[in-house]
From Swiss-Prot:
The gene is lepA. Its EC number is 3.6.5.n1. Residues 11-193 form the tr-type G domain. It comes from Lactococcus lactis subsp. cremoris (strain MG1363). This is Elongation factor 4. It catalyses: GTP + H2O = GDP + phosphate + H(+).
Amino acid sequence: MNLQEMNARKEKIRNFSIIAHIDHGKSTLADRILEQTETVSKREMQAQLLDSMDLERERGITIKLNAIELNYKAKDGETYIFHLIDTPGHVDFTYEVSRSLAACEGAILVVDAAQGIEAQTLANVYLALDNDLEILPVINKIDLPAADPEMVRQEIEDVIGLDASEAVLASAKAGIGIEEILEQIVEKVPAPQGEVDAPLKALIFDSVYDAYRGVILQIRVIDGSVKVGDRIQLMSNGKEFDVTEVGIFTPKAVSRDFLMAGDVGYVAAAIKTVADTRVGDTVTLASNPATEALEGYKEMNPMVFAGIYPIESNKFNDLREALEKLQLNDASLRFEPETSQALGFGFRCGFLGLLHMDVIQERLEREFGIDLIMTAPSVVYHINTTDGETLEVANPSEFPDPTRIENIEEPFVKAQIMVPNDFVGPVMELAQRKRGIFLTMDYLDANRVNIIYHIPLSEIVFDFFDKLKSSTKGYASFDYEISDYRPSNLVKMDILLNAEKVDALSFIVHKDFAFERGKVIVEKLKKLIPRQQFEVPIQATIGNKIVARSDIKALRKNVLAKCYGGDISRKRKLLEKQKAGKKRMKAIGSVEVPQEAFLSVLSMDEE
């Protein structure tokens, strides 16, 4: 292709993504767009086609982002090239969203006609506005009996401030309004900027590991072009690789001769290790490099940490390999080796949130077949010591001696909760119970309220989301961003089994709740740990002070069964002998802690 043809082709490219709250019909809309543009034959079509992980389809959520090229013949007779970049809607995966938005010029905002705007819709819209995207509102599910498109139209204008007069009324499920959406993309989404003949500049927005071809980069070409045989260079570390294949996804990978400015596709270049490629890095040509890199993504810091241990200790290396492979595709997962007296060798992993943690655990068990024990999640605390140091600690077992601690700061989040009027009471009560600090409350319309709180992240990590859903019958929607660190009155609670500390059961708790939490956990463990041949005391301690105790009674054999009648001293002798044996057992006996016991520390209910 000569330069003129390339520029003409670039004018026909439209890059867009779909943003929406969970369950507002984003993946279904993507399916309809694929059908309408005949990208996928009827035979291959299946629901949630872009959600390729089993886990995504089961949970009905989108986790990874996917990029696809479609051809659309518009009403003006021209054929346009669409690149649809599918994004997740869940709050834990905003990182994935920000990555896909960086590769687009436009975004379709899907809002449910019955539910209206929800907290994550807002969060994602602000991300899109930060990236200067053209936003096309679509009001979906208009065939629902409860749909009220006009109210939603008004809401989009009032709450987000977008002009919704031309918002498409659609039903992705019934296929209504799909063509209008496609025409709007052609008219309103701008063609990509960028010079076809400038030096190559491409943004890596995802990477996938393939056992045969090495790391495959998903890129959005900003300037220039790349073809097979080019030698590419990664700008962050200067490493060079030879391109073996370039192509696009139509969901399946299809190889092409070249990718040019505006294209979204993949590059394989025999890259061996995942560590060489960073999502957000810039790819350029070694022979004619670009002068400066593109603005990369901001690094996402993991907010929630937990220990992951293989149940069979010889699987440690398998677990490391599995984590490395997951990290290839999941830039936000962090891990480092750690050891625990109770659980042996494992890893301390950092996650964006609880759903992220859940998904990683399930993928490890499913895709790699490793049985795991997860410890209670914790957050990163800042500890100011008496000698003027500040420590960052994410693992309760690394807490310094209480006498060295001046004060402890914990991360707070700014939580935005949208909820129908009737449930304001329960939500505020829940937030207060989770040590929330009330900020503001705005009425969005006659019956929906937006409440903003500062809440400690450690309280959200436990079960805030589940509690919120159950106290509002599922109507609340919730989004949070990290705000700052604040001093809190926190203490570390240890659990002793048979007078031995089990490091994996330690956790950090606010002093006001320490006594109740200790009591609940001790009772829970009593139910979960099987009875032994000897009595096992379970104690919850803060420092050297025991705040709660419960005993697991010993199993015992009736040693008097063979004594008929018999003298009392004979019986006493047998009982004393049994007692001495139990005592000896207790001195050397160790207690097996089942997996449920570790999880019980998680599901701390205020029962």
